[in-house]
Amino acid sequence: MNALFVGHSYIDMTMLTDIMPSGDDKEVARDFAVSFGGNAVTAAFTCAKLGISTDLLTTVSDDWLGQMFMMMCQRYSISVYPRKVARCSLSFVLPKAGKRAILRARDNHYLRPFMKLDVSCYQALHLDGHQHDAAVYYVKAAREAGVMTSLDGGALRTNTEEVLHCTDVAVVAEAFCKELRLTAAETLKYLHARGVKVAAVTEGERGMIWSEEDGHVQHLHALHVPDEKVIDTSGAGDVFHGAYLASYLRSPTSPWAVHFDYARAASAHKVQHLGNEAGLPDDEAITTARLEFGGHR
């Protein structure tokens, strides 16, 4: 079981604070976490934590933050195929009351072309749409090789249309629907019209809807994590993507309802922890979340 992930990497600095300073004010945060970040990157770490052999093609810098990122990947036995940038990208994440504000500093001025790997050795490819040229190349190569392709559609990007035509599973956010000016149900039809086999829209605390090639729309509610246990919702969607991929790779013939049920429990675990790394689930944590918060399996 192995998968290739293609996306943009960050170092996330997450801080819990009751007051956001302004002007010349200073405040002290209640807690903080420093971790890896990025949509496909966090999904890759999730898959690795769940025992999947994971390769990652992502941006990497030579500065000390880039070195720290590579050490994180090494800790989880993730093989990295770096695309060089001058500086590591940063995200400052401020979670509060079930929401999260994010301020990013991104370096996407690539100093090297992306590596062209043989995708035929993988069982799945997951993209977040970043590294536009690499995303298009790899999704087409995977389709030609018969490798399952998965897209995290957090937002419309310049390459989204081209990528969708070679995507098997597209799980998009509400923001994606809003950019299209479509309802969630209309977005499912939009995705299927472009050849997507499994189309899904995540709706936060309301859960998700999805449909397969027969067009039948199904709903899966989110597990109810009490407000007092919700610490940091950032990265929960990325963990969701990584978990459904892990579930699929373990049992490709199982229904997608099973894969998505597994993934929602993984997300329920994540939101109880500060930062992406602390929130990575293992199978025991996913089972616990199901039992505690009302999962079916």
Task: Tell where the protein language model's regions lie, with residue ranges.
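Glycine-rich phosphate/adenosyl-contacting loop at the front of the ribokinase-like
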Residues: M1-D55, Q67, R297
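Hydrophobic anchor at the start of a short beta-strand
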Residues: A3, T54, V80, T149, ...
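Active-site metal-binding loops of divalent metal-dependent hydrolases
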Residues: S9, H130, V239
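Conserved N-terminal subdomain of the carbohydrate kinase-like
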Residues: D24-E27, V34, K49-A124, T287-R297
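Anion (oxyanion) recognition and catalysis
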Residues: A48, Q74, R143-E144, H192-A193
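Structural alpha-helical scaffold elements that stabilize or flank donor/cofactor-binding regions
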Residues: L117-D118, E162-V163, H192
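Conserved beta-alpha-beta core of the PfkB/ribokinase-like small-molecule kinase fold
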Residues: Q123-T187, G207
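Conserved phosphate-binding/catalytic region of the ribokinase-like
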Residues: A184-R297
